[in-house]
UniProtKB/Swiss-Prot annotation:
Keywords: Amino-acid biosynthesis, Cytoplasm, NADP, Oxidoreductase, Proline biosynthesis. The keyword Amino-acid biosynthesis applies. GO terms for molecular function: pyrroline-5-carboxylate reductase activity. This is Pyrroline-5-carboxylate reductase 1. PANTHER family: PYRROLINE-5-CARBOXYLATE REDUCTASE (PTHR11645), PYRROLINE-5-CARBOXYLATE REDUCTASE 1 (PTHR11645:SF49). It is found in: Cytoplasm. Belongs to the pyrroline-5-carboxylate reductase family. It catalyses: L-proline + NADP(+) = (S)-1-pyrroline-5-carboxylate + NADPH + 2 H(+); L-proline + NAD(+) = (S)-1-pyrroline-5-carboxylate + NADH + 2 H(+). The keyword Amino-acid biosynthesis applies. One of its GO terms (cellular component) is cytoplasm. Its main location: cytoplasm. Pathway: Amino-acid biosynthesis; L-proline biosynthesis; L-proline from L-glutamate 5-semialdehyde: step 1/1.
Amino acid sequence: MRTKKRTKEMLPIFDQKKVAFIGAGSMAEGMISGIVRANKIPKQNICVTNRSNTERLTELELQYGIKGALPNQLCIEDMDVLILAMKPKDAENALSSLKSRIQPHQLILSVLAGITTSFIEQSLLNEQPVVRVMPNTSSMIGASATAIALGKYVSEDLKKLAEALLGCMGEVYTIQENQMDIFTGIAGSGPAYFYYLMEFIEKTGEEAGLDKQLSRSIGAQTLLGAAKMLMETGEHPEILRDNITSPNGTTAAGLQALKKSGGGEAISQAIKHAAKRSKEISEDIEKTAAPLSGVIK
């Protein structure tokens, strides 16, 4: 299920809501950038914290106009939404230190790869509403494909809050938690596949005499146009492909070469291998954390 696009205005659902990012790495920054760009939440209501890197917090403050604070300076209890964005290996200690400060009404959004809602629920022990989130790096410009999986204590109102907040970064899809690995293979890692494709488009154009930047711009606009055709027409990609493929024409020649080189199968294998690796990472975390706290899968 995908959320509807929203206009750039302050939304009533965010009235007086305060959001804190626990962790200040690249994933947190991408989400902060998307949310700030959307201009739906007052910047002063967005906070970010990390263990001790004040230089990084100052950098984010200056870049995005939000508040940065060390854990002992941030009033966790006053927040409405807590976004867990630390490294997964640090989750055990972070949850342990936050446990006594988190309030039952607070919505927890977790972008911790491989860590389930059940694990977080059991770690906090007070029927905490938890939503597992998988954005991609396009969140930085408000164009992410973001998946959410709901924990068992998430109410309909909190689901709407999560969708509205994450909708600031792009499109939001509600999936089952056991579908997170394949979503990661398609959308989490997906931007890299297209960047890889663009490398070859740019290089080939340049070798044929095009300016490097021009070749890049042409390729990027072509990818953007194809994506918009899929989204706006609702047509099956095969139909759109057939519509521009004349017998013995240029597109047919290009597609034949692509198929001969294993293009379609390569794409399929890339997604499958990324999904497999996502599952392996989850299992590695399980081996480490399960004896301590419970359920990760």
